[in-house]
Amino acid sequence: MISLINNQDSKINITTATQRLARAIMLSQGQFSLLLACCNSTNKQQQLLSLLNEFLPLAITELSIPASAETLYTTITSALGSTQPEALMVQGLESVVAINQLIVSTNLMRDELSKRFEFPLVLWVNDEILRKLVWLAPDLKDWAAATIRFD
């Protein structure tokens, strides 16, 4: 009985968090906004993206960042070219080999992000990446809207 209740609570929390993320994306249409979505399971992230598509009436562009990436800005601009998607979801940060360098360079380039991107940028992070953001790039972390947790 307890596991059923916990499971139901978990589903409610996930749905609520997904709705919060969808609302944040909708409110940021046509302008840059950095959103952090924290989920420790990559499989769960995929399920959440499917659920998110049910809440959003717009096309979400997904970008899986390669493990060899050294800068987030260059990786995104190379992938998008001159395209300005309605929203961009970046996944795979947990697999980046030089994650510390990527986080520091993103912090240094944060003003360029807002100048170049006219869409909400959602970074999917896990607890470890979130801790690194706090320690290595507190300005970037503070610049982002509140972290939306999917636990």
Predicted regions and their residues:
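A short helix-turn-beta junction within AAA+ P-loop NTPase domains corresponding to the substrate/partner-engaging
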Residues: L136-D151
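Extended, compositionally biased accessory segments flanking or bridging domains
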Residues: M1-E86
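Short, aromatic/basic amphipathic alpha-helical patches
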Residues: Q47-F55, T106, K132-L140
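Conserved beta-strand segments of the P-loop GTPase G domain that flank and frequently precede/overlap
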Residues: L35-C38, T61-P66, L88-V96, V122-V125, ...
